[in-house]
Amino acid sequence: MSDLHRFQSLKILAHYDRLEAITRGEYPYPIDWHIYPSNHCQHSCEFCLFIQNGEQANYHVKLPRAILLKAVADAARLDARLIHFSGGGEPLLNRHTLEALKLAQQLSSERVSAGGKPL
């Protein structure tokens, strides 16, 4: 395993202020946000939770533009370090995801990723 992926025993010190807040009964906002723009997918993987009897489930969800952009703005306002676009399908099958990605980068999240790939 490379050093990049090895657990760092002192990593907890990077979040010491958050741990102190929790011990005081406070609930700090998450630093990693996962936004699921869509559960639509162009694949039919056998192991997928959204596949039933070899076919995609018939409930398709795409976040509306206003909700998607509000989620990104909220994450940035609350100092998210990572905004990750993923979900039960391909995030880019929601036509508003590109706009949301651009907004996330404009609002200065430290990292933005989609489908497991940093952008």
Q: Model features per residue range: what roles?
A:
Residues 2-119:
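Conserved alpha-helical substructure of the radical SAM core
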